[in-house]
Amino acid sequence: MESDEAAAVSPQATTPSGGTGASGPKKRGRKPKTKEDSQTPSSQQQSDVKMKESGKKTQQSPSVDEKYSQWKGLVPILYDWLANHNLVWPSLSCRWGPQLEQATYKNRQRLYLSEQTDGSVPNTLVIANCEVVKPRVAAAEHISQFNEEARSPFVKKYKTIIHPGEVNRIRELPQNSKIVATHTDSPDVLIWDVETQPNRHAVLGAANSRPDLILTGHQDNAEFALAMCPTEPFVLSGGKDKSVVLWSIQDHITTIGTDSKSSGSIIKQTGEGTDKNESPTVGPRGVYHGHEDTVEDVAFSPTSAQEFCSVGDDSCLILWDARTGTNPVTKVEKAHDADLHCVDWNPHDDNLILTGSADNTVRLFDRRKLTANGVGSPIYKFEGHKAAVLCVQWSPDKSSVFGSSAEDGLLNIWDYDRVSKKSDRAAKSPAGLFFQHAGHRDKVVDFHWNASDPWTIVSVSDDCETTGGGGTLQIWRMSDLIYRPEEEVVAELEKFKSHVMTCASKP
C-alpha cells in the first residue's frame, strides 16, 4: 500500500549532525567522509583565500554561488517545472521506476535512488514516490521559490532496502521496472524485486536486506558498468577484472502476463533470512575479454540481447556480439584522449553510439563507419563541458537529442540535427547544444530521462566540494518553447504579440 504520508527521503532523524555526506575523490563518485573532514575548506574556498592573500586584482570567472544565483533567476523563463530536493546523504545513481497513477494535473511514479553514508547508518537503496506535475500546469512564479536545504513535497520515501555496501549504480529491467540491479564495491551484481522486498528501518547495526538474486562471474570488483537489456531479461556488467559479463535472468522471473503492471516478479526461494549469502546465485552466460583496463560502462543494443558495447579506462570502445564468441567484433583503440566513463546506444537508431570521457568531450560513433580493427573516427565531437563527462543518455522523445552530465556541475542537452544547420549569427555556444541545466552546484553524477513523461529528467549531484557533503536531486522539464519547432513557437507567441507590445510601450 503506497502512502503519501510516508517520510520524505533522507529523514533528518537518521542523519549525523551537520547533515554532511562524503568526500575524497572516488572514480566517478566519492567515499563518504568523516565529520572532521567535512570541515576542510573546499577547493573553491581555498582558491578564494589564495586570491585574497595575493592581493592581485586578477579577473575571476563568476563563483559557483554567483552562477547558481544567475541560473535561479532564470528558472521561471527556462523551465516548465522544477522540483529541488535536498539529500543529506549523496546518491550516486537515480532512475525512474514504473508510473503508478495518472491524474488531472500530475502523475505519480516510482523513483529509485540511494543513500551513500559514512557508516554511522547503513547504506540504502531508496524507493520513493514522485509526483510529476504535468506540462503547463506549474505557475512560473512558484517553481523558483524553493529552499536549497529543504526536501521537496513532490518526493516521498516509500520503502528502504538496506544495501550490502554503498550503491554505485541502479538499473531497472525494462520489461518490468519493479526489478532493479545494483552495483556496489564487490564482484557481484545484486538483483532486487523492490515491490516484494520488506521495508527496513536503517539504523546502525541493522542486518542487510537479502537480494533476490546474486549474479556472479567477475573476478574483481565491478563497481559502475551496469546495463539491463531492453528486449530480453539479460544483464550486462563490467569491472576491474577488465571483463564484460553477460547473464540471463529469464529462468528466475515468473511471467504473469503481458500487462506491464503485472509483468512478473522474481521467483522466491524457500527459507527466510537477510544474509546475502543465502540468496540464490546465477552464473554468467558469457565472459568477454578485450579491454586492457577497468571497464567503466556498458550498453545493450536496442534491438538485440546478443549485441552490446563497453568502454573503459584503456580509452577503448568495444562492440560485442555474443553469437560470434567472446572476442570483440570491433575495437576502437583510441575512442577518446583519456579514460572513457560512459556509453549509450541510441534506442531509435541502432547504428549510433555515444561516449563520454575524462577528456571533457562527448563523441558520436556510427558503427557502419567502423572497420573490424576499429579504424574510423567519430562522426562528431561535442565540446561543451569543462570537466570530465560522467553520464550520457539518448532522449526517449527525439532520436537526435541526448544529454550529458559532468564534473563541471552542468547537464547539457544536445541535438545532433542542429549541428549541420548553419546560422547567420556567430555561434555563441557549442554546435548542437541547445539547453544547459545549471541547477547543480557540484558534479552531476547521474541523470535519467523519464520515458513515461516526455522531456522530464531526474538528476543528482554530489555536493562535497561546494557544501561539504550531501547531494541535490532535481526533477525538471525545460519549457517546450525551447525544443518545439520554430514555426510552432512563433505562431503561439504571435497570439501574445499585441499584449507584449502594449506592455513595452508603457513608461
Swiss-Prot record:
GO biological process, one term: DNA repair
Effect of residue 241 to N: In allele fve-2; loss of function allele that causes increased levels of FLC and late flowering
Phenotype of gene-disrupted mutants: Reduced H3K27me3 level but increased levels of histone H3 acetylation and H3K4me3 on FLC in the fve msi5 double mutant. Delayed flowering. Impaired systemic acquired resistance (SAR) toward pathogenic bacteria (e.g. Pseudomonas syringae pv tomato DC3000 (avrPto)). Lost ability of dehydroabietinal-dependent (DA, a diterpenoid tricyclic diterpene) to trigger flowering and systemic acquired resistance (SAR).
Function of the molecule: Core histone-binding subunit that may target chromatin assembly factors, chromatin remodeling factors and histone deacetylases to their histone substrates in a manner that is regulated by nucleosomal DNA. Component of the flowering autonomous pathway which positively regulates flowering by promoting transcriptional repression of the flowering repressor FLC. May promote histone deacetylation at the FLC locus leading to the formation of repressive chromatin structures. Forms a histone deacetylase complex with HDA5, HDA6 and FLD that represses FLC gene expression to control flowering time.
Keyword entries, A-Z: Acetylation, Chromatin regulator, Developmental protein, Differentiation, Flowering, Nucleus, Repeat, Repressor, Transcription, Transcription regulation, WD repeat
Tissue: Expressed in rosette leaves, cauline leaves, main stems and developing fruits. Expressed at higher levels in roots and flowers.
GO cellular component, one term: nucleolus
Biased composition (Polar residues): 258-272
Induction statement: Induced by dehydroabietinal-dependent (DA), a diterpenoid tricyclic diterpene that promotes flowering and systemic acquired resistance (SAR).
GO molecular function, one term: metal ion binding
UniProt entry tagged with the keyword Acetylation: yes
Sequence ranges of the WD repeats: 95-137, 162-202, 217-257, 290-330, 335-375, 384-424, 439-486
Protein name: WD-40 repeat-containing protein MSI4
InterPro entries linked to this entry: Histone-bd_RBBP4-like_N (IPR022052), WD40/YVTN_repeat-like_dom_sf (IPR015943), WD40_repeat_dom_sf (IPR036322), WD40_rpt (IPR001680), WD_repeat_RBAP46/RBAP48/MSI1 (IPR050459)
Cell compartment(s), UniProt: Nucleus
Organism of this sequence: Arabidopsis thaliana
Renumbered residue ranges of the record's region Disordered: 1-66, 258-282
Entry note about domains: The DWD box is required for interaction with DDB1A.
Family per similarity comment: Belongs to the WD repeat RBAP46/RBAP48/MSI1 family.
Modified residues (N-acetylmethionine): 1
Quaternary structure and interacting proteins, as annotated: Interacts with AHL16 and HOS1. Interacts with LHP1, PDP1, PDP2 and PDP3. Component of the PRC2 (polycomb repressive complex 2) complex which regulates histone methylation on histone H3K27.
